[in-house]
């Protein structure tokens, strides 16, 4: 299934950054963190609440959606590679 939509406020990059504590523990992660949050925002904007608004787009799949949200909750370590993938996908028209 599709993960719960964080809501219009929840997908905001600034809210995401605050939640993740971007750059608090390690300043080097701030850029990566910001990029991730922006990618996550674009992902949700593109795919909508349940992925239906992104029909025909390969990025709008439940696997990626869950990965984005797990990373966003800090359950998995956000690696530069994962972030790069999310940001790259999210940037695709």
Swiss-Prot record:
Localized within the skin and proboscis and are most readily isolated from body mucus secretions. It comes from the Eukaryota. The keyword Secreted applies. GO terms for biological process: killing of cells of another organism. It is found in: Secreted. Disulfide bonds join 16-37, 22-33, 47-60. GO terms for cellular component: extracellular region. Cytolysin that shows hemolytic activity (on bovine erythrocytes, HC(50)=5.75 mg/ml). This hemolytic activity is completely inhibited by small unilamelar vesicles composed of PC/PG, PC/PI and PC/PS in 1:1 molar ratios (with at least 100 mg/ml concentration). Belongs to the worm cytolysin family. This is Parbolysin P4.
């Amino acid at each position: 299934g599709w993960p719960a939509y964080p809501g219009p406020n929840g997908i905001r990059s600034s809210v995401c950054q605050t939640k993740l504590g971007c750059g608090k523990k390690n300043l080097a992660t701030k850029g990566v963190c910001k990029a991730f949050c922006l990618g996550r925002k674009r992902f949700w904007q593109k795919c909508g609440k349940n992925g239906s608004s992104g029909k025909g787009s390969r990025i709008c799949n439940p696997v990626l959606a869950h990965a984005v949200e797990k990373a966003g909750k800090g359950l998995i370590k956000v690696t530069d590679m994962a972030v790069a993938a999310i940001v790259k996908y999210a940037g695709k028209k």
